[in-house]
């Protein structure tokens, strides 16, 4: 029997939709989706016990249960229901993909819109952030790319609060798994491409093709793609987009928007570039020459949504660094960065080597995540040994792997170079700080914005930036106490 969902839903008191039997709320409709690892049909009774008013499934065996409705395609039914319950979305949708740089770009985009007096928001690895609205949206899942239902719930709520611009990250996993559903966006961009997630995609070609689904499956015909011209595979990407009739523009040293000079320091950078035959200069507090293309991708995004370029550049110069992205801790020479891929780690280390004071040394603290791409561990060890003066290997998010074995795989890549191995990440950070001398720089890499450490199935509170701040504060207190003791002893 074919159901008219709109008519069917009128017969029930329905408060919302859910695809999770554990979090489904009373009077919500539960859609029993069959995923790669979990089948929602196995949890229909759980959903009903938790208060689901209806269950939609494409498994006929389950329809003997009261309140269970059979449909031929449960995903199509979900999409139809989403249009009924969460039809609204911000007028301008912008999506960003790439191995590294996604979080930075979506943040820069939303910040710049707000600086130009527009309400904007971004969704991604860091979470949801809203500019120009006091409403707080709770229960945002911690995924780079949300599933389609949660994305549309949030987009609907943002539109209800008059948010006009929404920028969001699109991961290769999310694209491959169809989490964007039928989402169509105005602008897409490609920040970078290098090895990552081979545990999932198996080959770099599969990984690249997964990312390109954003451009072929989710960009409106009237939309435009913005590409980093410095991507090694850029010619393949451009040919692929041409063959799929996707309009694009490139940014970079050889881009349509050409970066001609970057001058970096510990306090920011100046970027000279040419756009439409006009020479521009952008001064920013954002550290890292690799951020130049990210900033200009953000600039072009606003340009193609109708803003004047001069106004964009003026506003863009005021954007703030993103937490855990080359984050300089309280004016010290200690940096926290999310660089968890070989390419990102190499770029971060090269950048800091180039801007460190004369005579200073560069130390790096990092580990690798468990149950993730194992092939990058030795590569990252090799990169650290090549570009850092001191290497400290510690734990990242070991998950269900033996952390000692993860560290051993990293150390194999280091070869004959010297290193220090410290299991506890907190102790490794303290060790790195204790061994800093004047003009030295310390990079704490891999976790960035994360405020947890995953050990087994537990998320333990842990924040690199806060560990640094607390330890620096304790050192300051100790020094003050020592000064007080010395001064009190000299009083006659």
Swiss-Prot record:
| Gene from which the chain derives | murE
Q: Which cofactor does it need?
A: Mg(2+)
Q: Where is this motif: Meso-diaminopimelate recognition motif?
A: 396-399
What species does this protein belong to? Rickettsia typhi (strain ATCC VR-144 / Wilmington)
Q: Which residues carry this modification: N6-carboxylysine?
A: 211
**Matches recorded under SUPFAM superfamilies:** MurD-like peptide ligases, catalytic domain, MurD-like peptide ligases, peptide-binding domain, MurE/MurF N-terminal domain
PTM summary from the entry reads: Carboxylation is probably crucial for Mg(2+) binding and, consequently, for the gamma-phosphate positioning of ATP.
User: Which GO molecular function terms does the record list?
Assistant: ATP binding; magnesium ion binding; UDP-N-acetylmuramoylalanyl-D-glutamate-2,6-diaminopimelate ligase activity
Query: Which taxonomic lineage does the organism of this UniProt entry have?
Result: Bacteria, Pseudomonadati, Pseudomonadota, Alphaproteobacteria, Rickettsiales
The UniProt record gives the binding positions of ATP as: 98-104
Q: What is this protein called?
A: UDP-N-acetylmuramoyl-L-alanyl-D-glutamate--2,6-diaminopimelate ligase
């Amino acid at each position: 029997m074919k159901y008219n969902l709109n008519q069917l839903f009128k017969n029930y008191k329905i408060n919302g939709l859910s695809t999770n039997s554990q979090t489904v709320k009373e009077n919500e409709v539960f859609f029993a989706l069959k995923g790669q690892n979990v089948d929602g049909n196995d949890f229909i009774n759980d959903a009903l016990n938790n208060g689901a008013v209806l269950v939609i499934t494409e498994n006929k065996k389950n329809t003997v249960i009261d309140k269970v409705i059979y449909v031929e395609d449960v995903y199509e039914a979900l999409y139809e229901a989403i249009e009924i319950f969460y039809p609204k979305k911000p007028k301008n949708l912008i999506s960003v993909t790439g191995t590294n740089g996604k979080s930075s770009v979506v943040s820069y985009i939303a910040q710049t819109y707000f600086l130009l007096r527009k309400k904007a928001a971004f969704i991604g690895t860091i979470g949801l952030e809203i500019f120009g609205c006091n409403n707080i949206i709770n229960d945002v899942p911690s995924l780079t790319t949300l599933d389609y239902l949660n994305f549309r719930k949030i987009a609907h709520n943002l539109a209800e609060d008059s948010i006009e611009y929404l920028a969001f990250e699109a991961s290769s996993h999310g694209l491959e798994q169809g989490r964007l559903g039928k989402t169509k966006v105005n602008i897409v961009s490609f920040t970078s491409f290098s090895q990552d997630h081979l545990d999932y995609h198996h080959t770099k070609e599969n990984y690249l093709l997964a990312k390109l689904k954003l451009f072929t499956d989710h960009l409106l015909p009237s939309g435009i793609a913005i590409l980093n011209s410095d991507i090694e595979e850029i010619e393949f990407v451009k040919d692929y987009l041409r063959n799929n009739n996707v309009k694009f523009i490139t940014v970079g040293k050889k881009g349509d928007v050409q970066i001609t000079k970057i001058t970096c320091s510990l306090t920011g950078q100046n970027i000279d570039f040419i756009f439409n035959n006009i020479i521009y200069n952008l001064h920013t507090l954002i550290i890292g020459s690799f951020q130049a293309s990210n900033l200009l991708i953000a600039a072009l995004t606003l340009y193609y949504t109708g803003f004047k370029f001069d106004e964009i550049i003026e506003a863009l110069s005021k954007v703030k660094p993103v937490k855990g992205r080359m984050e300089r801790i309280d004016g010290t020479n200690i940096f926290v960065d999310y660089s968890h891929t070989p390419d990102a780690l190499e770029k971060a280390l090269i950048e800091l080597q180039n801007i460190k004071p004369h005579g200073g040394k560069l130390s790096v603290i990092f580990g690798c995540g468990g149950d993730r791409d194992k092939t990058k561990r030795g590569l990252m060890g090799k990169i650290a040994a090549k570009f850092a003066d001191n290497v400290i290997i510690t734990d990242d998010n070991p998950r269900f792997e033996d952390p000692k074995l993860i560290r051993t795989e990293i150390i194999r890549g280091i070869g004959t170079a010297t290193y220090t191995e410290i299991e506890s990440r907190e102790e490794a950070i303290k060790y790195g700080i204790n061994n800093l001398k004047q003009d030295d720089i310390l990079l704490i890499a891999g976790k960035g914005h994360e405020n947890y450490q995953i050990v087994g199935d537990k998320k333990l509170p842990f924040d690199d930036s806060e560990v640094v701040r607390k330890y620096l504060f304790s050192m300051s207190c100790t020094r003050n106490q020592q000064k007080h003791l010395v001064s009190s002893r000299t009083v006659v």
